[in-house]
């Protein structure tokens, strides 16, 4: 089967479980690219028309359920003699596995799971579907705490060859209602009894009735009263003890009548564990056994013994058609051992009792269970067309038939039966389903199933039907793609008045956890330094060269970044930021001046020129003398230097002073009288 594609859509990947009637495969929907579970009827049943009919009929009915606590049936079909049902794929453990791992659960957890299971049953019951096999093996719990009930209404069949092997008959016997065990008419209340057993096992870690065979267990369901769970686990409140005992009443009349009732009481206990719960089963808690019929049962082990070591699904996923675990012996509790020890019976009585039990087991197993599974005796459907639905249901249920009520808009009075399917006077077996089409009155509209539709499609559909969109909530979902409907209120197929509002919950997809990272500030760092620092922080870098550096020290340094500091991201998300860094430093070109202009300037003028042009001029010796030449008569940059040569400045002659003393005469020379001189004329030659 692996690799086979069913319906040109579902590719079988691996077998994840096997039950008495079917295999379950993990598959991939090639159209929507998601995992699904595909249940395939075993080959030995493919030629049994009744089993195949029920297999498909029940699956089609479940497909119309819309509840977050129901494993959705997505498709049903036949290909190459392969009958299959496609369901949502749920990653999780069965409640049975959880109880095996942890033992008794905290009562708060049991209440929470119980409410969700009851809501799933309520949804099914409103659509006329009885589960008939409520047990921990058919309750899946995901890691996120989502509770999903599976195997709704999947018809189970048991023939005489199966009855012959009583040790492999229906591992579900631990959760049977008394009416199931007797093979009599069952209704919605049978599911509530089984839910009571599940609650019992959650808070105690054991099943209330156990035995060495399914028949023995079935007899205990009929005859014996369970030990109150509080006698086993003192930590549970009296209110929850009373609720469980009421749910497990032998007579359906004394039980909870609807799933809504049990949900209400569970909610009360959740808010106030000390609340008083009305229980019709409040009898002397020391009275563990109540005889319902004169049947002698040997080896009356205590009701509450350890659960069978292998009391679980063959599938471990979605289905429990049969268990092969009923061979283990019960472990008696100490009080009952004491009772048995004090009661000595003769071998003859034990032999007689054993024979009676074998006879009872064969009778119950072959007639009762077979009757339950195969539908019972023939009855004729009466004509209830035109009657009020309450009267019609009473008549049909009185004949042992199950009633599925469907509302249809009509000009007839609301609540009047319009049609019956199968037709009036048809012969069917007790336990068969009869569909009543009931007038919803004028203006009544059947709410469509919006599962897996997007919000736009929902709006268009509602508008075309004359309905309005109510509240739109969003929730994370591991199984429903983002943007599609998870649940709706009112539920699919409910009849409402025109203009009514329909509330939907839309999937936000899988919840993605976030984390916070710190992005370091790398301003002023070189590009390589910045890359290293950010890489150590788990941040990628996109370096971008920016403006030119204004100094040699700025060249190649980071001057800005796109993100820094604390940043919240999706867990595992890759973060890359941009950093901007300075380019190379370009030395600016300085202005140049013609130093040749200095020639001919006076020293003062040359100094002024030098100051103005920021050039160092050396060699100026006088403010009045003129520059004769320049060391560089070409272009000189600001900040540069030149030297100049100044012209010689002519000094004016000094006049001779009159009456200057004569120089002494040489010896032996006669002094000559000195002649007065004429003063020289001053001026330029």
Swiss-Prot record:
UniProt keyword list: ATP-binding, Kinase, Nucleotide-binding, Repeat, Serine/threonine-protein kinase, Transferase
EC number(s) reported in the record: 2.7.11.1
Uppermost EC category: transferase
Feature: compositional bias, Acidic residues: 306-329
Keyword ATP-binding part of the UniProt annotation: yes
Superkingdom field: Bacteria
Region (Disordered): 277-339, 480-500, 623-685
Keyword ATP-binding: yes
InterPro entries cross-referenced by the UniProt entry: Kinase-like_dom_sf, PASTA_dom, Prot_kinase_dom, Protein_kinase_ATP_BS, Ser/Thr_kinase_AS
Reactions accelerated catalytically: L-seryl-[protein] + ATP = O-phospho-L-seryl-[protein] + ADP + H(+); L-threonyl-[protein] + ATP = O-phospho-L-threonyl-[protein] + ADP + H(+)
Binding residues annotated for ATP, in chain numbering: 16-24, 39
Residues in Protein kinase domain copies: 10-275
Active site: 143
UniProt cross-references to SUPFAM superfamilies, sorted A to Z: Protein kinase-like (PK-like) (SSF56112)
Pfam families assigned: PASTA, Pkinase
Compositionally biased region (Low complexity): 627-645, 654-685
Domain PASTA: 376-440, 441-508, 513-581, 589-648
Similarity section: Belongs to the protein kinase superfamily. Ser/Thr protein kinase family.
Name of the protein in its database record: Probable serine/threonine-protein kinase CPE1738
Biological source species: Clostridium perfringens (strain 13 / Type A)
